[in-house]
Amino acid sequence: GDKSSRQLAAKVARFMTKRGPWGSTAEGPSMADSYEHARWQGHFHWFATGVVGLADYATTTNDVQLLRYLKSYYEYSRQFGIVRIGFFPAVVTPLAQRRSASQKIYGGTGQNDEGCALVDMLDIALMLSEAGVGDYWDDIDSMVRNHLVEHQMLDRKRLKHIVSHSPKSEMRPEINNTENVIERNIGAFASCAEPTKMYAWWTMCCNANMMLAIHKAWDATVRFDNGLAQVNLLLNRVSPWVDIDSHLPYEGKVVLRNKQAERMSVRIPLWVDRTALRCEVNGRKVPIRWLGRQLQVEDLQPGDTVTITFPMVETIEKHTERTYNTTFTCRFKGNTLIDISPRPKEFSLKRISSDDGKFTELNKEMGYPLYQRDHLKANQAPTKEVTRYVHHH
């Protein structure tokens, strides 16, 4: 790239990693230097969006020292909230301070997430994983399958219910429009959510960023170079090199329809029992060869069909979100959350602020329930016929 641009980027990166904003007074042992180990506190998205830029710079220039630092940042930051579902609190501070501030400002002690923070963490995890700094593909898979897609508003009936039970807003014709508002916003992504329900409220940054994050995860599902198809995520994806038909989370089955690959390297999630995995090429069982978590399939021809099967694993897990003072019981199939409890009807907060600086008083009828996923408890994947688009790289 351009030498002067690289020099400027290096200066910005050095400035952004000065001791000032880094270092945390959060709870925990203080024998480790918080600055040197990339500890931080404050507004999650405000901080993480800068780290996205640092990660882009570090992976582009192979700044190894900065990459190690960002690895520490990510592994520290993923401890807040519930990474297994992609829930990250909007603000990270010492617990007592956070609870006190939330109670004073919002009338409750919980801490909602922000979609942009989830996007930042996914983006950082993607860049670090693809650079070989860490293996965070299971984190990415969990974020995508859970809170990322759950942030999208698709239920017209529920949105109408929320509108009918919400305080009336002052309409300003020069900036507000009341024409088909719900219909025009189906598919938009809400800005804020608790672990079990969303606020039907959003700002445009979260809306745009979450759409972009879905594309980035889709794009990273498979990479291709010199005859090798690298499958990173077991998600449905059509590509010029291989089509992926994923039956997850209904059943442990993935079908890879080869177009150009001579060999494939397929990352198998941590929850899969590798000893129980089976692989067939054109219906013929082939020997299992591993490279870490990567299943190696070789000597492929265009038109070959690779079928990978394994037992679907269902787990019950406990995850504590301390600002809510709640331990959630989470039922997973693989990395997909299919149920969660408790599901309180009331919001943790009594009011929420908006971009105009005003507050909206909340009531239990204004919640948009998440994880209405009884259909995912079935053991056979539904199918439908669609026209698929192939992205040209």
Which residues fall in each region the model found?
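Well-ordered alpha-helical segments within folded domains of soluble proteins
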Residues: 1, 41-59, 110-129, 203-215, ...
